[in-house]
From Swiss-Prot:
It comes from Pseudomonas savastanoi pv. phaseolicola (strain 1448A / Race 6). GO terms for biological process: glutamate biosynthetic process; glutamine catabolic process. This is Glutaminase. It holds the Pfam family Glutaminase. GO terms for molecular function: glutaminase activity. Substrate binds at S61, N111, E155, N162, Y186, Y238, V256. Homotetramer. The gene is glsA. Gene3D superfamilies: DD-peptidase/beta-lactamase superfamily.
Length: 302
């Protein structure tokens, strides 16, 4: 596996320079674009990594999976009364579909859906940001995980569209908390700084029927883990879930920080990171690396 990861990174490195770092979030725009890392965490507890796998980056929308898992953990099926689990077919921050469907987001991985999940968690936890941080620390076994306050503040200062979505949902009685408080929590979640190894380990439970190997915790039931994986497969890559399924063939979740996490059910979790994004907002080189890895080991679930 180690030789394979090194080989794959060498093969995709020539693609560096073809994408663009997410500069619409000012604090992310200064990230060095030529970085590339990958980590694989097996269900047996083994970790393999290559490249810049220990370099921290902003996980951004990957955090939406952690928020969803938290909500399922304390509220179960009740959360689906407030949002769906269908692909949206619209931009991740679209307001048009949200109004047409009367404030009920299509799924938890578009921004409106993630805000509803955050609203649900906000009502459950006294300190939602700390609760999320501690949850992620537990999942990856790294007590040093923190949220980058500069990134969170940068996103908060450019919150207008997310605030509009929240207030629109509130007008349909599908958003119950204080909008500004929920947005603060949401951006702190997105601003968590992790590396490929941290994220591969943190997502290991989704490859292992909901069981976290290194902590010994049953995070979700096997059925719930399967359900989360199914939503990742259909809605985890912005408007490129179909292309990711075609090329990589695994449940996945991406973020505009350049990270992509992929789940190989019953076998492993993988995280790849390269900050240059394609037109759909996903890591250009990261997707190419996952495509090669999945093909070489025949990991596609299809």
């Amino acid at each position: 596996m180690q030789d394979l990861l090194n080989e794959i990174l060498d093969e995709v490195r020539p693609l560096l320079g073809q994408g663009k770092v997410a500069d619409y979030i000012p604090a992310l725009g200064g990230v060095r674009p030529d970085q590339l890392g990958i980590a694989v965490y097996g269900n047996d507890g083994q970790v393999f990594s290559a490249g810049d796998a220990e370099t921290q980056f902003s996980i951004q929308s990957i955090s939406k999976v952690f928020s969803l898992v938290q909500a399922i953990g304390h509220s179960g099926e009740d959360i689906w009364q407030r949002l769906g689990h269908e692909p949206s077919g619209q931009p991740f921050n679209s307001l048009v579909q949200l109004e047409f469907e009367r404030g009920r987001p299509r799924n938890p991985f578009i921004n409106a859906g993630a805000l509803v999940i955050c609203d649900i968690n906000q009502a459950r936890f006294a300190a939602p940001s700390l609760s999320m941080r501690d949850f992620v620390r537990r999942l990856c076994g790294n007590r040093a995980i923190t949220s980058d306050s500069k990134v969170a503040e940068s996103e908060y200062q450019h919150r207008s569209r997310n605030a509009a979505a929240a207030y629109l949902m509130k007008s349909f009685d599908n958003f119950h908390g204080d909008v500004e408080d929920v947005l603060r929590s949401y951006f702190h979640h997105c601003a968590l700084s992790m590396n490929c190894i941290d994220l591969a380990k943190a997502f290991g439970f989704l490859a292992n029927q909901g069981f976290c190997t290194h902590s010994g915790e049953q995070i979700l039931t096997a059925r719930q883990a399967t359900q989360v994986n199914s939503i990742m497969a259909t809605s985890g890559l912005y408007d490129e879930a179909g292309n990711f399924a075609y090329r990589v063939g695994l449940p996945g979740k991406s973020g505009v920080g350049g990270g992509i996490v992929a789940i190989v059910p019953e076998r492993a979790s993988v995280c790849v990171w390269s900050p240059e994004l394609n037109a759909a907002g996903n890591s250009l080189v990261g997707m190419a690396a996952l495509e090669k890895l999945s093909a070489r080991i025949d990991w596609s679930v299809f």
